[in-house]
Amino acid sequence: MKRKYILKKNWEFQKIIDSKKQFIFPTIILYYKKSDSFQIGISIPKKFAIAVKRNYLKRQIKSILDQIRPYNLSYEMILIVRKNYLNLNFLQKQQEIKKIIERISNGKEKIK
């Protein structure tokens, strides 16, 4: 995943979270905001795993996003991983992220 697609700064994360548009899944919370271009930030809480494992999970998510190629979406997004995500295998993780990206690309705002 190219650097231009990645959000890193705290104020960038806060701006998107303050928009209060979100999808909540058992394994992932996705905050999003309409934008001119696609950008994504990935957050994994410190209490879930040591730094090596958190970085490994971030690399996995970036790899999955590279396979899906959602770069034509005009959204800024924050993916926050939940504890259940750690127990999934790679294929299940891939399906979860695909499901989320499809939801946002179809424009389904309400999720219950």
From Swiss-Prot:
Enzyme Commission numbers on file: 3.1.26.5
Superkingdom as given in the UniProt entry: Bacteria
GO cellular component terms given for this protein: ribonuclease P complex
Pfam families in UniProt: Ribonuclease_P (PF00825)
Catalytic reaction equation(s): Endonucleolytic cleavage of RNA, removing 5'-extranucleotides from tRNA precursor
One of the record's GO molecular function terms: 3'-tRNA processing endoribonuclease activity
An annotated GO BP: tRNA 5'-leader removal
Keyword annotations of the record: Endonuclease, Hydrolase, Nuclease, RNA-binding, tRNA processing
Keyword tRNA processing: yes
InterPro entries: Ribosomal_Su5_D2-typ_SF, Ribsml_uS5_D2-typ_fold_subgr, RNase_P, RNase_P_CS
Function: RNaseP catalyzes the removal of the 5'-leader sequence from pre-tRNA to produce the mature 5'-terminus. It can also cleave other RNA substrates such as 4.5S RNA. The protein component plays an auxiliary but essential role in vivo by binding to the 5'-leader sequence and broadening the substrate specificity of the ribozyme.
Protein family according to the UniProt entry: Belongs to the RnpA family.
Assembly with partners or alone: Consists of a catalytic RNA component (M1 or rnpB) and a protein subunit.
NCBIfam families xref list: rnpA
Protein name: Ribonuclease P protein component
